[in-house]
Amino acid sequence: MATRIPFTESQWEELENQALVFKYLAANMPVPPHLLFLIKRPFLFSSSSSSSSSSSFFSPTLSPHFGWNVYEMGMGRKIDAEPGRCRRTDGKKWRCSKEAYPDSKYCERHMHRGKNRSSSRKPPPTQFTPNLFLDSSSRRRRSGYMDDFFSIEPSGSIKSCSGSAMEDNDDGSCRGINNEEKQPDRHCFILGTDLRTRERPLMLEEKLKQRDHDNEEEQGSKRFYRFLDEWPSSKSSVSTSLFI
């Protein structure tokens, strides 16, 4: 009686294939796709004859019935049909036509798309700086007085504005002080000090000192003229000399 082989030829091929897969797993290396394809061969081919299936598998050209869906990895991922092409897609049929960057799945344009997307959509932070120091013009208008309240004329006398509210004219005239009564009280505080209570009395005091000084000069000039008027005129001196 002839001894029978415990395994058939197809079973022996499957055992060798499983041994190779085990070696890859023991070495902690990725398993080649063709070994996984051999394991799934019974589900892909008909079980009519093992010889015909093996001959069709080991043929140099595969039948067109088997597409890229046959080469599946262990985690269910399909092998890329164009491995050198960028994998950026819109989720449907469109795919980027540029070549992938070395050691990357995407091109240079789509490599950092996800990282920069969140930061680019954020609006820039707005910085609010409190305006503590106001302009001199706005501060003067709010306080209700101007610097030219006392205007000095070319002759030396001081001209003050009085009466009802007046508008600024082209000739340099000043506003009336009644504007302060019409406007509500607006105080300007800078670091705990009130500009109205500190600056306005100082300015008025300087204007009053200037006016007193000009008045003294004017009175001195008048006294000098009166002293000269007491002397006899030249006509009277001539007449007296002729009379003698």
UniProtKB/Swiss-Prot annotation:
**Keywords from the UniProt entry:** Activator, Nucleus, Transcription, Transcription regulation
Q: Where is the QLQ domain?
A: 6-41
Q: In which tissues is it expressed?
A: Strongly expressed in actively growing and developing tissues, such as roots, upper stems, and shoot tips containing the shoot apical meristem (SAM) and flower buds. Also expressed in mature flowers, but weakly expressed in mature stems and leaves.
Per the UniProt record, one Pfam family is WRC
Ranges of Basic residues composition bias in the record? 110-120
The listed locations are: Nucleus
Q: What is known of its domains?
A: The QLQ domain and WRC domain may be involved in protein-protein interaction and DNA-binding, respectively.
What is the protein name stated in its UniProt record?
Growth-regulating factor 6
Which gene is the coding source of this polypeptide chain? GRF6
